[in-house]
Design a protein with these regions (language model features):
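Conserved catalytic or regulatory cores that recognize and/or transform ribose-phosphate-containing ligands
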Residues: 1-109
Length: 109
């Protein structure tokens, strides 16, 4: 079974874009697809966005996200991912690892 990692922009978005990650996770789940994401726990349950910038330490968040990414077989890129340095890094890692890539606004690569 293929597990997807959801990647997308977070910084400079309200609530760190968690609502978009939650929506994408729900769509994948409804399609019978297993997924991991920085806005979900390891069981796929939505996490609450950090309340303050002090709660959102991006380096730690990136470390946790990369740990999830390497457990997956494919990556699903949310709209706007090209503007995010972290999502760009996740994308490049996924390509290097030979993961299937899908794009929220385009389909599969």
């Amino acid at each position: 079974m293929t597990t997807f990692y959801i990647s997308g922009p977070m910084d400079e978005y309200p609530q760190h874009n968690y609502p978009a990650f939650h929506k994408a996770g729900e769509e994948l789940k409804n399609s019978g697809i297993t997924f991991l994401s920085p806005a979900h726990d390891m069981s796929g349950n939505p996490l609450q966005p950090p309340n303050t910038e002090e709660e959102y330490l991006w380096q730690e968040h990136l470390r946790q996200s990369l740990q999830k990414l390497v457990l997956c077989d494919a990556i699903h890129m949310l709209k706007g991912w090209q503007t995010s340095p972290n999502a760009g890094l996740e994308y490049r890692i996924a390509l290097t690892l030979g993961m299937t890539t899908t794009f929220q606004d385009q389909g599969q690569e």
